[in-house]
Amino acid sequence: MSKFKEIMGWLWPIILGLLIALVIKTYFFSLVRVDGTSMYPNLQNNELVALFKQGKIKRGTVIVFDAYGVDANAQPKDKYVKRVIGLPGDKIEYKNDGKLYVNGVRQSQSYITKKQQVAGTLTLQANEAKGITLGSGQIFTVPKDKYFVLGDNRAASNDSRYYGFVPTNKILGTVKTGFWNDKAQVINHFVPAK
């Protein structure tokens, strides 16, 4: 019996530690690797970022979502990293000079250059807003329980312009970067200026 107690004496802390780690990874926090350049220059290809599963989503928040079923080209287990531009119920308008308006209020896009703000397609391909041309003065509304997301590298990003709005139930959490990332401020704490 004392041999059993001895084994359990060192085995129990290991089991407890693994259980705590599993709970943390499942419900609170995990690491995700950025795949591709759609968030350049703020996130780099292969950069490791923290995913907070209980993070609050607001305009400007960078999120990770399960792309399977959102993007027709996504495979099971594909995860996309994008920036939230529109929340459920928001009215989105792009002016022809790349200025972004949400609910009639101009939004800061200081996290990317003026050239990046107007790069990529300006005609929405998504079914919910198909044919709306950004920059033409047309306004569209983000549906209930969905988000409009864009990559920071607008010219190379496969985002809501192509596959539509991201359902709330597909969002895995919010992204945070380490202090060593010189763009950490625009990922961790960006708040669109009014």
Regions found by a protein language model. Name each.
Residues 3, 7-8, 12, 45-194:
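Soluble "head" domains of membrane/secretory-pathway proteins
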Residues 30-45:
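Alpha-helical transmembrane signal-anchor/signal-peptide segments
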